Amino acid sequence: MSKQTFTTTFAGKPLVVEVGQVAKQANGATVVRYGESTVLTAAVMSKKMSTGDFFPLQVNYEEKMYAAGKFPGGWMKREGRPSTDATLTARLIDRPIRPMFAEGFRNEVQVINTVLSYDEDASAPMAAMLGSSLALSISDIPFNGPIAGVQVAYVEGEFIINPDKAQQEASLLELTVAGTKDAINMVESGAKELPEAIMLEALLVGHKAIQELIAFQEEIVAAVGKEKAEVELLQVAADLQAEIIETYNADLQQAVQVEEKKAREAATEAVKEQVMAAYEERYAEDEEHDRIMRDVAEILEQMEHAEVRRLITEDKVRPDGRRVDEIRPLAAEIDFLPRVHGSGLFTRGQTQALSVLTLAPMGDTQIIDGLEPEYKKRFLHHYNFPQYSVGETGRYGAAGRREIGHGALGERALAQVLPSLEEFPYAIRLVAEVLESNGSSSQASICAGTLALMAGGVPIKAPVAGIAMGLISDGTNYTVLTDIQGLEDHFGDMDFKVAGTRQGITALQMDIKIEGITPQILEEALAQAKKARFEILDLIEATIAEPRPELAPTAPKIDTIKIDVDKIKVVIGKGGETIDKIIAETGVKIDIDEEGNVSIYSSDQDAINRAKEIIASLVREAKVGEVYHAKVVRIEKFGAFVNLFDKTDALVHISEIAWSRTANVSDVLEIGEEVDVKVIKVDDKGRIDASMKALVPRPPKPEKSEAKKEGKHD
């Protein structure tokens, strides 16, 4: 196929899609140019079905530093593992694409997005999402798209689609929404305590823009799309399915209704083992043994799936016996750990998270060097999910995509209420350790994080709580669930996480397994989540009503002073010699910003005071009218040089020593003598003149004799 180009304008920027010129051996490939951002997307599919019990979809978002005209960092000077932002963007693209493949599709699919040029005012992630949908849609891969995504900002009461950098910085909302022509199927958002009504409106505005992009894609697919390949779907034998349901469904139904998680798992596992053993014995010698046993396992999974959904939609009974809008039992505790700067333990049913706070000097902030200009990240929220939290063994090591994503969600939720740098000049790190999990662990980490921040004395604007909402839908009827547990998440249609304060929402995240949900469901889920959020906030506020007025004794104390910008080099010294000497002498940490704000950190207040005195003396300037107790350091014929303080000397001219005439300076002063002087002049070169006589009254002039007076009259 020769190169074909499709052009439109979207959100005020040119949008160009090129097909047929590059990556022609992939099943589908596109180059998307949005503004001056350029993204190459290639989609490929394996020829055979994988043997696993899940759909092996891999979406990558690769940031090439040359795209922003930058050299990679590190001694190797080449791109390495994906950045956190790249990982989050890959997840952002994966989530709306995954539901658009048929049930039972098991061929491996890879969608690789490579950022070739980067324009910070034209969203490369949204170009990559468009390219991913298009590459799949024009290929022979059986993808039931297209989908599209947009970013939505909220500035001065107006919604803006795909905002530029300045608009993003002014926005009260950072929303990414994706979906099909008919419905929304993915949401990711941070917000500055916005009400549910505005969030819902933002979603609808975003979906309207999505429909424009889908119409554009449909034109391209009609022009260059390939016929979809015929692939084998994982399907079970109907007669085998009917037999197992008839024989074992009653036993499995009973097991599913056991309320406690571990007991329920044991009961369902016992039924499954019984069935597997029976069919293993029957088909041990059959040449189709492996396929049959795979089918048996899949049928049992489908039976459990169907029963959980039936109980909720028909009987309005959840696996643990709760009402559809009922939260599991809650517990909260602060100061779980000694020595740390703050800690909070939050428990919701069988989900438990411990959050630990660490405060540090601003010099410890994380430096982010990606495609955007380098910047410092003050707040970090890390989420760890050890396998023991679900009673299993498993992999341990670096954080995976899921842990990075859950950590970022908590970070967005809590960042909205943090004090400004001027109010609280610390770098802040929260680490959420999931100790037990039966669903909604990311939201438990947000609640635990609030407890840790308040216990640690961080003056947050308001406490934040999070809740996960679920959905069971048969296409006609649906049920929205509050505080979903693991089984409801696994077998349900939606995982909709909502975090916020009493004033409004600070973060949203939604993933669904169906092709989309309606505005009505979104509205109902947001309203139900608000009720649950307030219930959790009641518990948090009962545990700790407001942030503590003092930091933990182990937290670094801080003091700040302001110096003139031209004095920064004086404090730092040649090659950092002066500041290193201060740090070595006092044991403090010192940060100096470009505006002359000096922050001094230590757990020892005396050390802070000493460092502050040293810095103050280094930048101290003599001022006209001020009096100093000085020491004579040099004597010349024309006057004496005196040291006012540190390395600051002044000249006391011979005429300024006394009101009477001084013949020789050395007759009056000697080196090492201490005298009081008053500064009378500082010239534009910083040279200082001082006076001794200005500190004593001027003696009266002697009166003239009467004789002279009389003579004068004559």
From Swiss-Prot:
Q: Where is this region: Disordered?
A: 691-714
Biased-composition ranges, Basic and acidic residues, are 700-714
| Pfam families named in the record | KH_1, PNPase, RNase_PH, RNase_PH_C, S1
- Stated EC number for the protein is 2.7.7.8
> Which transformation does this protein catalyse, written as a reaction?
RNA(n+1) + phosphate = RNA(n) + a ribonucleoside 5'-diphosphate
Q: Name what cofactor the protein needs.
A: Mg(2+)
What GO biological process terms are annotated to this protein in UniProt?
Answer: mRNA catabolic process; RNA processing
Q: What class of enzyme is it?
A: transferase
List, in alphabetical order, the Gene Ontology terms for molecular function in this entry.
3'-5'-RNA exonuclease activity; magnesium ion binding; polyribonucleotide nucleotidyltransferase activity; RNA binding
Instruction: State the UniProt keywords alphabetically.
Output: Cytoplasm, Magnesium, Metal-binding, Nucleotidyltransferase, RNA-binding, Transferase
Q: What GO CC annotations are associated with the protein?
A: cytosol
State its location(s): Cytoplasm
- For binding Mg(2+), which residues are annotated in this chain's numbering? 489, 495
Domain KH, chain residue ranges per copy: 556-615
In terms of superkingdom, the source organism counts as Bacteria
Q: Which SUPFAM superfamilies match?
A: Eukaryotic type KH-domain (KH-domain type I), Nucleic acid-binding proteins, Polynucleotide phosphorylase/guanosine pentaphosphate synthase (PNPase/GPSI), domain 3, Ribonuclease PH domain 2-like, Ribosomal protein S5 domain 2-like
Q: Taking every annotated instance into account, which residue ranges of this chain make up the domain S1 motif?
A: 625-693
Report the function annotation for this chain.
Involved in mRNA degradation. Catalyzes the phosphorolysis of single-stranded polyribonucleotides processively in the 3'- to 5'-direction.
* Protein family membership: Belongs to the polyribonucleotide nucleotidyltransferase family.
Q: What is this protein called?
A: Polyribonucleotide nucleotidyltransferase
Q: What is the organism of origin for this protein?
A: Streptococcus equi subsp. zooepidemicus (strain H70)
